[in-house]
Amino acid sequence: MSQPSISKSMTIGESGLAVVFAATAFLCVIAAAKALDAPFAFHAALSAAASVAAVFCIVNRYFERPAALPPAEINGRPNYNMGPIKFSSFMAMFWGIAGFLVGLIIASQLAWPALNFDLPWISFGRLRPLHTSAVIFAFGGNVLIATSFYVVQKSCRVRLAGDLAPWFVVVGYNFFILVAGTGYLLGVTQSKEYAEPEWYADLWLTIVWVVYLLVFLATIIKRKEPHIFVANWFYLAFIVTIAVLHLGNNPALPVSAFGSKSYVAWGGIQDAMFQWWYGHNAVGFFLTAGFLAIMYYFIPKRAERPIYSYRLSIIHFWALIFLYIWAGPHHLHYTALPDWTQTLGMTFSIMLWMPSWGGMINGLMTLSGAWDKLRTDPVLRMLVVSVAFYGMSTFEGPMMSIKVVNSLSHYTDWTIGHVHSGALGWVGFVSFGALYCLVPWAWNRKGLYSLKLVNWHFWVATLGIVLYISAMWVSGILQGLMWRAYTSLGFLEYSFIETVEAMHPFYIIRAAGGGLFLIGALIMAYNLWMTVRVGEAEVQMPVALQPAE
């Protein structure tokens, strides 16, 4: 049966988008000419070039349009849209390696400050937000977008909603990362942790994120599967809540429409409260809810076992939604924040122990009857160890929110160790495991190029994590104890520089651990590249039709 022919004319969507990008390019050229500072001029010129490239791609798409529409099904299966997933998977590995490398550089700068080289562009103050944004938002964000687009298609048994919209999301999101990252190197920042991009980058992200939400929702609405799979609940919670947090924390008043500088709309303790309501829930919904969606899809899929308890996943979801959003004030213990607010944040943080560990138990117990696979499947082992790190981090976090513990841990390297046990152990490993699954699926390969390389990656990265977090735990507790030590006369027993000197060996160990983690990521990148290049294609068998009842 022949496929329906396509009219050799641009669609309304293509025409409209081409006009919008052409107008954007024109406005960006004007903005670059009238810019009040060099970074804004650079970003305006970069945006103009990107807009022109977008127009070219849309026009080229028109000229290279095939004679017929792509089939709705291939061998009885929906013809899924894998292009945006492949793009985001590639960008995840690119930004991941870049972010890990920058992390190694700044860890080395803390151990050997001369490595700053007195150059502003590579100083610790500019590279640190570049590292956090590259790892959290560039690496983690691309993993979440790629996996969410894959999971929502497969679990709903329909092609991703929209034609250009998914591509707009993945390319637009990575352009935001490029603007934000180059801005940090040029000294453009709002000085709000995890929310450093200036006003124009925030506006662009808002547009991209709204389209992301619409694509995801539209795919769910047109689903052929009556049930909405649990992973999609967590993805939707992540997308919606991050939108609310972004809009709440980032209102800013630009000094000029042609300058990069702006002032945050909030002030004083209100700004601090908004910032850590955002900052903590960026952890809660970007780095937790989104990656729990990965856990709930990829572990059962890899283990070939159903989720241990669907009822527990429902409890886990709703408890996480209602409790996490209130826990932000524990970042502001012993500050000008009202004491009742600090106590409220501490209370909700402690309550988070229960749903977090419920989710961990659900993930681990999914392997019931398949524990032997941990010996033979390093990808599944990586996914399961990530859940163990999730449990450890979600125990340590509530414990550190208790005021008496926080009085020792706050502002010390213990917090850095806690963050990285979650970031490297939980987010890193579950992302690696997901990409090891996703790349062969998206590129239609029978399997990975080498499971031995996955095994090497697992052990090298695990050793790196253990070195990193152990060094930070010891240095953080030592730091806190030295800061609070007094002589019999009531004077500080140690000067500040003495506490810094005591940290030096631990900073060297941290850099070594980060280096091992980077080596593991490079092994992974090679393995995935070879999987795509030389991996054996998987033959898709037709789906047998179910007999009518």
Curated annotation (Swiss-Prot):
Positions that bind Cu cation: 280, 330-331
GO annotation (BP), single: oxidative phosphorylation
Residues where heme b 1; low-spin binds: 131, 420
GO cellular component, one term: plasma membrane
PROSITE patterns per UniProt: COX1, COX1_CUB
Cofactor: Cu(2+); heme b
Catalytic reaction equation(s): 4 Fe(II)-[cytochrome c] + O2 + 8 H(+)(in) = 4 Fe(III)-[cytochrome c] + 2 H2O + 4 H(+)(out)
Induction comment from the UniProt entry of this chain: By low oxygen levels.
Cofactor note: Binds 1 copper ion per subunit, denoted as copper B.
UniProt entry tagged with the keyword Cell division: no
Transmembrane intervals: 12-32, 39-59, 87-107, 132-152, 168-188, 201-221, 228-248, 279-299, 312-332, 344-364, 382-402, 423-443, 458-478, 512-532
Enzyme Commission number(s) of this protein: 7.1.1.9
Top EC class for this record: translocase
InterPro entries assigned to the protein according to its UniProt record, in alphabetical order: Cyt_c_oxase-like_su1_dom, Cyt_c_oxase-like_su1_sf, Cyt_C_Oxase_1, Cyt_c_Oxase_su1_BS, Cyt_c_oxidase_cbb3_su1
Subcellular localization(s) per the UniProt record: Cell membrane
Membrane topology of this protein: Multi-pass membrane protein
Family per record: Belongs to the heme-copper respiratory oxidase family.
Note: This cytochrome oxidase is probably a cbb3-type.
Protein name (Swiss-Prot/TrEMBL): Cytochrome c oxidase subunit 1 homolog, bacteroid
Organism lineage: Bacteria, Pseudomonadati, Pseudomonadota, Alphaproteobacteria, Hyphomicrobiales
